[in-house]
Design a protein with these regions (language model features):
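Beta-strand-enriched cores of mature, soluble protein domains
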Residues: 1-154
């Protein structure tokens, strides 16, 4: 099997779905990036260098497990796609549940979720694997989502 490892930083926002089912639809984009992590006497730091190239597109639906209005402190499910261009799209769904909660008192939120890769199209047609997401949402509703993926291709 071939293994693909990736780290990406997606930026975007979620909006309520128009159908009234308490589903939020998120859409975000991530550029090509080179990450450098450095451990020093002062601690650890990461730098990101944006590279020329296409952007990946992340589209998902998010719903609280109890199907109530989406809010902090409530476990949720998220499913959707990540498109890497040229018809190469990953499908994913939640492993367990995701959660998020306030950070401080300025309206910022932090959360995390794990997704299972469920195939896709193009290169990812029979892909399996796991993607982790550590995300933040600011008071204005803008999100930043750090992904780490370990994908296996047959």
């Amino acid at each position: 099997m071939r293994r693909i490892l990736y780290n990406m930083v997606f930026r975007g926002r979620g909006e309520s779905a128009p159908d009234g089912e308490n589903i939020s639809i998120t859409k975000s984009f991530a550029p090509c990036v080179r990450f450098t992590t450095e451990i020093t006497a002062d601690g650890v730091d990461m730098r990101m260098e944006e590279l020329d190239g296409p952007k990946a597109e992340f589209v998902s639906k998010v719903q609280n497990i109890d199907r109530s209005e989406f809010a902090a402190g409530k476990p949720f499910r998220e499913w959707g796609t990540i498109s890497f261009g040229n018809g190469n799209v990953l499908n994913f769904d939640t492993v367990g549940t995701g959660e998020f909660s306030p950070v401080g008192d300025d309206g910022q939120m932090q959360g995390g979720i794990v997704w299972c890769v469920e195939g896709g199209t193009g290169l990812f047609e029979k892909a399996t694997g796991i993607i982790t997401s550590n995300f933040g949402i600011d008071a204005a509703g803008d999100g930043i989502d750090y992904h780490t993926g370990v994908i296996y291709l047959p």
